[in-house]
């Protein structure tokens, strides 16, 4: 994950430069200055994770490449929207989500601060979450069939629901999670899961 490595490397360079500058100077209380320089370096590195400078001049050729720049998981699924893509990554046994914004000539970094969960509901054997990309206002829905087996899912927008399957040998069952792009969401949005109508943003 280059995102983290670059910040560690730049932080080390900045601190080393500050350390040498302080050691060669004639100021008093050098130890205090060195500790202060270390704290400031850590703060700058942390701030750069929320406001990455490279996002202004680095463009990626695919959403997956943008994902791998600041995520270490393997991409399992990509759900494409008009201005963004929703990527499902897996790191170990855990899944992680990222929304990658699209620009004219490629893709930019997907940052956690740009994602908002705008809906969540557990109903009739399913767990539903709705995520919005703040800048584009595009939304994606995640539907987990918690009781196992495939689900019959449709919505009022005729969205295409893609899915990932997770097999549980201990329970001798397969569990499915469904993903779809649903555009700019409003409170009237509804989907039907196994014949049950659900409005995730009114719950």
Residue ranges of predicted features:
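Transmembrane alpha-helical segments of multi-pass membrane proteins
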Residues: 32-45
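Short amphipathic beta-strand and strand-loop transition segments with alternating hydrophobic
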Residues: 73-78, 127-132, 165-168
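Ser/Thr-rich low-complexity repeats and stalk/linker segments
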Residues: 152-203
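Structural motif
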Residues: 142-149
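Membrane-embedded alpha-helical segments of integral membrane proteins
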Residues: 1-22
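Membrane-interface helix-boundary motifs at transmembrane edges
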Residues: 23-34
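N-terminal export/targeting and maturation segments
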Residues: 43-119
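Extracellular ectodomain segments of secreted/surface proteins
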Residues: 115-142
């Amino acid at each position: 994950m280059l995102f983290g490595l670059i910040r560690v490397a730049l932080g080390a360079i900045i601190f080393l430069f500050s350390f040498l500058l302080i050691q060669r100077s004639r100021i008093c209380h050098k130890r205090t200055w060195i500790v202060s320089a270390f704290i400031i370096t850590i703060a700058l590195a942390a701030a750069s994770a929320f406001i990455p400078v490279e996002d202004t001049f680095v463009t990626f050729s695919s959403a997956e490449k943008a994902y791998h720049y600041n995520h270490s998981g393997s991409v399992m699924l990509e759900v494409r929207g008009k201005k963004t893509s929703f990527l499902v990554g897996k790191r170990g046994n855990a899944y992680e989500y990222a929304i990658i914004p699209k620009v004219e000539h490629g893709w930019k970094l997907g940052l956690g601060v740009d994602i908002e969960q705008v809906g969540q509901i557990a109903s009739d054997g399913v767990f539903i979450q709705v995520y919005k990309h703040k800048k584009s206002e595009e939304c994606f829905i995640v539907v987990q069939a918690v009781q196992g087996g495939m689900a019959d899912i449709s919505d009022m927008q005729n969205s295409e629901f893609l899915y990932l399957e997770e097999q549980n040998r201990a329970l001798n069952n397969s569990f499915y999670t469904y993903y779809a792009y649903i555009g700019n969401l409003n409170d009237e949005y509804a989907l039907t899961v196994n014949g049950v109508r659900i409005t995730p943003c009114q719950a």
